[in-house]
Amino acid sequence: MSKTYATLGELKPGNFIIIDGEPCRIVEMSKAKTGKHGSAKAHVVAIGLFTGNKKTLVAPVDQRVEVPVIEKRVGQIIADMGDLLQVMDMETFETFEVEKPSDEKLREKLKPGVEVEYWVVMGKRMIIRTR
C-alpha cells in the first residue's frame, strides 16, 4: 500500500486522506479551538474515491494522518467488456481490467482505441478522464 504521512492541519479541501483504510478526497474542513486549555481540533468531511461514501474525521490539528500516494498514468482502452474495460498502459504495455467510472458523460467517451488517464491509488486503478 503506497501511503505517506502529513499533519492534519496542513491539509485543505481538495487534498486526499485515508480514513478507515479508504482513500478519500477532502470536501470540507474546519478548525476550532475547543476551550481555554484545549488544543485545536479539525473536522474533516471527505468522500471515498472508490465507493463515493461520505466519511468524517474529528482529530487534533497536530495529529499525523495517512495520505495516499496517487500515481497518474496514461493507458489505451483495448476492449469494452460490459462493466469492465481492458486497458493497456502506454509506458509498460501491461494490460489490466478496470471498472467503468460512474460518471455518464465520461462513460460515453470510453470506446476501444481511446487514450485515458488513470490513477493507481493503494493498488487499485480508476479511470479519471480521456486525453
UniProtKB/Swiss-Prot annotation:
Q: Which positions are tagged coiled coil?
A: none
List the protein's name. Answer: Translation initiation factor 5A
Source species: Staphylothermus marinus (strain ATCC 43588 / DSM 3639 / JCM 9404 / F1)
Question: InterPro entries annotated for this entry?
Answer: IF5A-like, IF5A-like_N, NA-bd_OB-fold, Rib_uL2_dom2, Trans_elong_IF5A_hypusine_site, Transl_elong_IF5A_arc, Transl_elong_IF5A_C, Translation_prot_SH3-like_sf
Tell me, what is an example of a GO biological process annotation in this record?
Answer: positive regulation of translational elongation
Q: Where is the signal peptide?
A: none
Determine if Magnesium is one of this entry's keywords.
no
Q: Which UniProt keywords apply?
A: Cytoplasm, Hypusine, Initiation factor, Protein biosynthesis
Any GO MF annotation of the entry: ribosome binding
Q: Which PROSITE patterns match?
A: IF5A_HYPUSINE
Q: According to its UniProt record, which protein family does this protein belong to?
A: Belongs to the eIF-5A family.
Give the UniProt subcellular location, in the record's own words.
Cytoplasm
